[in-house]
Amino acid sequence: MSKDLEVAGRYANALFQVAQDKDLVDVFSEELTELKAALNANKDFVKLLENPTFTTEQKKNLASAVFEKINPTLRDFIYLLIDRSREDYLSVIADVYQKRVNDLRGVADADVYSVVPLSEQELTALSRVFAAKMNKTKLNIQNHIDKSLLGGVKVVIGTRIYDDSLKTKLKDMERQIKA
């Protein structure tokens, strides 16, 4: 685990604990998702927030103006990050926090690679089958197009890969023939 992810993980876990204690897990989840989208959409704001020439107080004022409508506890958390010069971790913290929420809810993210876009019915069927395999209640599936697969699908859930693509089957056959 990289040091950045380790640091972000500690902050995300602490925030998650506070959210559970205050029954704000879903509120923080929504607000962090919106906050991350805003940070991704406005790189100039991120540059200002991470600019070392700005004082802590200036950064807090900037954050206060931009994040005025978020939950006060979450705003205080952002101030804490600024105080500790960790504002550049905000996006990663949001990701780790969301993973904790998903773990709590029994939800996992899955990337499904196919040659053509899959229908809603196909995605639902894959979700049902692989959610059961992973002991999850639900999978959030992202369908990616990969023409190199030739056919079939490849499902990636965390570190697990289920490859039922024609490309892999042909490679397996080639290996068996050469053996």
Swiss-Prot record:
* Keyword Ion transport tagged: yes
Compartments in which it is found: Cell membrane
Q: What membrane topology does this protein have?
A: Peripheral membrane protein
Q: Does the keyword Membrane apply?
A: yes
Q: Which range is the signal sequence, renumbered to this chain?
A: none
Question: What's in the GO CC field?
Answer: plasma membrane; proton-transporting ATP synthase complex
Q: List the disulfide bonds.
A: none
What keywords were assigned to this record? ATP synthesis, Cell membrane, CF(1), Hydrogen ion transport, Ion transport, Membrane, Transport
* GO molecular function list: proton-transporting ATP synthase activity, rotational mechanism
Q: Which HAMAP family match?
A: ATP_synth_delta_bact (MF_01416)
- Describe the task this protein carries out: F(1)F(0) ATP synthase produces ATP from ADP in the presence of a proton or sodium gradient. F-type ATPases consist of two structural domains, F(1) containing the extramembraneous catalytic core and F(0) containing the membrane proton channel, linked together by a central stalk and a peripheral stalk. During catalysis, ATP synthesis in the catalytic domain of F(1) is coupled via a rotary mechanism of the central stalk subunits to proton translocation.
Instruction: State how it assembles.
Output: F-type ATPases have 2 components, F(1) - the catalytic core - and F(0) - the membrane proton channel. F(1) has five subunits: alpha(3), beta(3), gamma(1), delta(1), epsilon(1). F(0) has three main subunits: a(1), b(2) and c(10-14). The alpha and beta chains form an alternating ring which encloses part of the gamma chain. F(1) is attached to F(0) by a central stalk formed by the gamma and epsilon chains, while a peripheral stalk is formed by the delta and b chains.
Q: Which family does it belong to?
A: Belongs to the ATPase delta chain family.
Instruction: List the protein's name.
Output: ATP synthase subunit delta
Q: What is the protein's species of origin?
A: Listeria innocua serovar 6a (strain ATCC BAA-680 / CLIP 11262)
